[in-house]
Design a protein with these regions (language model features):
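Charged, often Cys/His-bearing segments associated with DNA-binding zinc-finger transcription factors
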Residues: 1-62, 92, 96-234
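Short, flexible loop/turn motifs enriched in small residues
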Residues: 63-69
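A short, conserved beta-strand element enriched in hydrophobic/aromatic residues
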Residues: 70-74, 79-89, 97
Length: 234
């Protein structure tokens, strides 16, 4: 569900066509339960090897008829770094988002350059994080509009996944669903490719399955692939 632009009801019908009876409310509960857990378990795999030039921006997500702000960061290649859904657009929200993106990163993994729009909230947040020692004082803050084209294009691809939802009811349910969307986007970009033993979507499926303890382990799978290769070559 989190990989494709489809509603819960449409997925219910598609499963029914294949003889599987699942109510759309059950699919909704599955997403709420497993999307955040998937994001948690796979975070180590897709949050690796970022370019030191980061692009920060926010896009709008409608929750109960009101706009909320989805803060997002990608590197200059377009790889997803992190995201954070906030009810407000403020220096406090920007700081919380950037602090989340920096959390757990080694010194050499932190950005050398941050490019944002001209919203003053980013400048205030970056200044505070530098003062607290969470961001290097040498980190450059740029406000070059065209450099953010890559993240604005990425917003559009994420919005394609969000559109069938036709709005969310609460911020927690919106955030839970978006976590699933963001993880699937990161996998489609190839950010976890080094840990996928098989090419394409099959490798991504097996990575998710292994994260939840489903199917053979990575070692067993790799040995099986080697045995198959040698048998085919014989």
């Amino acid at each position: 569900y989190c990989r494709y632009p489809i509603s819960h009801r449409d997925l219910e019908e598609m499963l029914a066509e294949r003889g599987i009876s699942v109510d759309h409310t059950t699919i909704y509960r599955w997403v709420q339960c497993y999307a955040p857990e998937m994001e948690k378990r796979l975070r180590w795999f897709w949050r690796r090897g970022f370019d030191p030039s980061w692009r920060l921006d926010e896009t709008y997500v409608k929750v109960r008829g009101k706009w909320t702000y989805l803060y997002r960061a990608v590197d200059k290649r377009g790889d997803t770094i992190d995201f954070y859904l906030s009810p407000t657009r403020s220096a406090k929200a920007a700081k919380r988002f950037l602090g989340k993106a920096l959390r757990g990163l080694k010194h050499w993994e932190k950005p050398a350059t941050l490019n944002t729009d001209k919203a003053p909230s980013y400048g205030a947040a970056i200044t505070e994080l530098k003062r607290e020692g969470k961001l290097d004082r040498e980190t450059a803050h740029r406000q070059v509009k065209y450099l953010n084209n890559v993240i604005e294009a990425d917003h559009g691809k994420l919005k394609i996944l969000i559109k069938p939802m036709r709005g969310f009811k609460t911020i927690p349910t919106a955030y839970a669903t978006i976590k699933g969307f963001e993880v699937m986007r990161a996998l489609r970009k190839g950010q976890a490719r080094p840990w996928c033993l098989q090419p394409g979507i099959r490798g991504e499926v097996r990575l998710v399955e292994r994260a939840f303890g489903i199917g053979p382990s990575a070692l067993t799978e790799a040995m099986g692939m080697l045995n198959h290769h040698f048998a085919a070559a014989a």
